[in-house]
Amino acid sequence: MKYDIIGDIHGCLQEFQNLTEKLGYNWSSGLPVHPDQRKLAFVGDITDRGPHSLRMIEIVWELVIHKKVAYYAPGNHCNKLYRFFLGRNVTIAHGLETTVAEYEALPSHKQNMIKEKFITLYEQSPLYHVLDEKRLLVCHAGIRQDYIGRQDKKVQTFVLYGDITGEKHADGSPVRRDWAKEYKGTTWIVYGHTPVKEPRFVNHTVNIDTGAVFGGKLTGLRYPEMEIVSVPSSLPFVPEKFRPIS
């Protein structure tokens, strides 16, 4: 099986359509379909900050849950939206406010439909996907080699948030260790979460979050070809969001 792994979309629907078309997908049915049956895999954070978060939920639900032709690993923004939909007390900030504003503008029956779809998508998706006979792993923020195969709370924190130290940068964002430098495995780990100006290959890991929602690019990785395909963002460039990893 061949896969096209998509970086953090964050509600950037137009960029997602442009990227999938560049990857050879056809949208005539209203969903991206590849003539060679390649499968999409999402590294999470499909919502928040961008303009079309709810449409992204519908598309990913259709592909992953309804048609079962794609893979989705939830990100930290997905986890927070899930908790919001469950009625938990979450702070509506850091991008969640854009998704909530879209949601609250809907009539109640449509709200219920979106909420049910996202809760189902989140609950039926594992923390990470191991594909191609363990040669490929798709997750949101990365994973340590000794965590592969585990699903416990420590692993959940790592795959959602990265290798956080507990310290904060001056702007309040968490300090993260560069786990990829320590990774010695042969399974390719494809992830996102931390915006980088260009896809970052370190050992057998690739960060494909090229900051589409911050005016960078939306990036896909063609696997097993290991080819990078990107499209430019239509949003303004925010340079301070592209922070070097500690």
From Swiss-Prot:
InterPro entries: Ap4A_hydrolase, Bis(5'-nucleosyl)-tetraP_PrpE, Calcineurin-like_PHP_ApaH, Metallo-depent_PP-like, MPP_PrpE-like
Coiled-coil annotated residue ranges, if any: none
Keywords: Hydrolase, Nickel
Presence of keyword Zinc: no
Cofactor(s) it depends on: Ni(2+)
Free-text function comment from the UniProt entry: Asymmetrically hydrolyzes Ap4p to yield AMP and ATP.
Protein name: Bis(5'-nucleosyl)-tetraphosphatase PrpE [asymmetrical]
Gene name tied to this protein: prpE
